[in-house]
Amino acid sequence: MILTSVLGSGPRSGSSLWPLLGSSLSLRVRSTSATDTHHVELARERSKTVTSFYNQSAIDVVAEKPSVRLTPTMMLYSGRSQDGSHLLKSGRYLQQELPVRIAHRIKGFRSLPFIIGCNPTILHVHELYIRAFQKLTDFPPIKDQADEAQYCQLVRQLLDDHKDVVTLLAEGLRESRKHIEDEKLVRYFLDKTLTSRLGIRMLATHHLALHEDKPDFVGIICTRLSPKKIIEKWVDFARRLCEHKYGNAPRVRINGHVAARFPFIPMPLDYILPELLKNAMRATMESHLDTPYNVPDVVITIANNDVDLIIRISDRGGGIAHKDLDRVMDYHFTTAEASTQDPRISPLFGHLDMHSGGQSGPMHGFGFGLPTSRAYAEYLGGSLQLQSLQGIGTDVYLRLRHIDGREESFRI
């Protein structure tokens, strides 16, 4: 039974569902003080969300529309105009596209089994999407630059509102783990939700970045990206985490096409590389606990060709056990021992939204890292594959398609 079939078309007096939904769908207002005035406004907004939760007709209509995905080449060569008309064109595209993509994801939440969909954390994320849909569809058509500037403010707000969605989904599904009977359904839901989120954030961030005049960039697209430099940035990040946890970190050697430069979008690399590097360093340190200050290097090889970019990360961390190899790409599987660390205090996925900066955090956690990285790579027309020699180490191959237009590319 799915969530919508149980919820029906609207709340009824005395319905037993209200206690189940709990505090996420209720807010008491007791006074008219300055603080409570804010609570009144929040209550009104959440009341609208609840109404929309039960009145899905507008969402259903939009969810039937197909998504219009752009190639990076289209984004790169859309050009700039002195009068700012490119910003209006981009803003109008977003205004049409974002509600469609969000409606598709709301439909995905409604397809979840009832017991999972009613988990308070999952329900909170569902509510975030409904609220975003409301705000986007309530915004009047963009007619001029003043409208576009207001729309940018809304987009920034929504990006901030949704910055913790990955962590919340991981937490909610971990809480619901014992109720999951169909692993394939959950994997499909997560693949779709996480890659859709990546696409939305790329498009939204690209539009905001079009307002900036940054050398070698058109929006979020770097016209002369150096794989070596972006790898070095995340090597430094991963080594700091590793040193904080283990007191030392493996050295990293980078070889191959180290001088390569080409147009590319750094954002997916900023999402995937930290996870792969943390895995390699953790495996290396934990397989050499007797000699923590004498550990083998992690070796990264860059291979650039006319079709794609390949990054191989090789470690001597003992490899992956045969019994685990088929499961490492499954959501919520992790080779790390269970930890009592509260994920809300130190979220594993902070780096996915570029908010971790230099802070230290856990070297392992929910078991979302590899499957999320795989989903992102496949969404971008590439792949993520592992070759493991148990007792020796692991090679991870990240393959991403070029965006220069010479070969067929992916769509965002």
Curated annotation (Swiss-Prot):
Residues engaged in binding ATP: 279, 315, 334-335, 364, 367, 370
Function: Serine/threonine-protein kinase component of macronutrients metabolism. Forms a functional kinase and phosphatase pair with PPM1K, serving as a metabolic regulatory node that coordinates branched-chain amino acids (BCAAs) with glucose and lipid metabolism via two distinct phosphoprotein targets: mitochondrial BCKDHA subunit of the branched-chain alpha-ketoacid dehydrogenase (BCKDH) complex and cytosolic ACLY, a lipogenic enzyme of Krebs cycle.
Subunit structure, as described in the record: Homodimer. Homotetramer. Dimerizes through interaction of two opposing nucleotide-binding domains. Interacts with E2 component of the branched-chain alpha-ketoacid dehydrogenase (BCKDH) complex. Competes with BCKDK for binding to the E2 component; this interaction is modulated by branched-chain alpha-keto acids. At steady state, BCKDH holoenzyme contains BCKDK and BCKDHA is phosphorylated. In response to high levels of branched-chain alpha-keto acids, the inhibitory BCKDK is replaced by activating PPM1K leading to BCKDHA dephosphorylation and BCAA degradation.
Name of the featured protein: Branched-chain alpha-ketoacid dehydrogenase kinase
Keywords: Acetylation, ATP-binding, Kinase, Mitochondrion, Nucleotide-binding, Phosphoprotein, Transferase, Transit peptide
Family: Belongs to the PDK/BCKDK protein kinase family.
InterPro entries reported in the protein's UniProt record: AK/P_DHK_N_sf, BCDHK/PDK_N, BCKD/PDK, HATPase_C_sf, His_kinase_dom, Sig_transdc_His_kin-like_C
Activation/inhibition comment: The ATP-ase activity is up-regulated by potassium and rubidium ions but not by sodium ions. Up-regulated in the presence of apo- or lipoylated-DBT/E2b subunit of the BCKDH complex.
Residue sites binding K(+) per the record: 328, 330, 333, 367
One Pfam family this sequence matches: HATPase_c
Transit sequence range: 1-30
EC number(s) given by UniProt: 2.7.11.1, 2.7.11.4
Phosphoserine sites (modified residues): 31, 356, 360
Keyword Metal-binding part of the UniProt annotation: no
Biological processes, Gene Ontology terms: branched-chain amino acid catabolic process; isoleucine catabolic process; L-leucine catabolic process; lipid biosynthetic process; regulation of acetyl-CoA biosynthetic process from pyruvate; regulation of glucose metabolic process; spermatogenesis; valine catabolic process
Positions bound to Mg(2+): 279
N6-acetyllysine: modified positions: 192, 233
Protein's cellular compartments: Mitochondrion matrix; Mitochondrion
One function term, GO molecular function aspect: protein serine/threonine kinase activity
Record's comment on post-translational modification: Autophosphorylated.
Top-rank EC class of the record's enzyme: transferase
Residues annotated as domain Histidine kinase: 159-404
